[in-house]
A protein has these predicted regions:
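Surface-exposed, charge/polar-rich loops and edge strands
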Residues: 1-129
Length: 129
């Protein structure tokens, strides 16, 4: 993740869970003095060790996150997202709205309704940049 960003490449997440996982991993590896991490609520590892600033770290496969991304959130890793059309007024809609402007989201959903796209888990997908 860090090498990809350092090389100037884009990170395109597939699914909202991937977005939250990647952004949470960045929080875990960010310098302890970074105010963006404090603002997002990073509390260190379960064992209390503060690993921030150690660069690339391995995140346990059973790790969890409480990261809530919404309009105004800063994305440090993810540049774009491929995701399905989510239910209005959901936390997933908030995450999607954090990556695009309100007008872009409204336009996409109006087209989806007009063109009879499928919604939810087995629906059509969109690319948000």
């Amino acid at each position: 993740m860090h090498a990809t960003k350092a090389a100037g490449h884009r990170v395109i997440a597939v699914g909202t869970t991937a977005v939250r996982s990647l952004e949470s991993a960045w929080d875990a590896a960010a310098p302890a003095s970074d105010p963006a991490v404090t603002a997002r609520g990073f509390e260190g590892r379960e064992d209390g060790a503060d690993v921030r600033g150690e660069g690339d770290i391995t995140v346990r496969e059973d790790a969890t996150t409480n990261l809530y991304l919404m309009p105004g959130s800063t994305f440090h890793v993810v540049d774009a997202l491929i995701t399905n059309f989510h239910v209005p007024r959901s936390t997933l809609m908030m995450l999607v709205s954090a990556l695009a402007t309100r007008d872009q989201i409204i336009d996409a959903y109006e087209e989806a309704v007009r063109e009879k796209y499928r919604f939810f888990s087995f629906g059509d997908a969109m690319l948000i940049e």
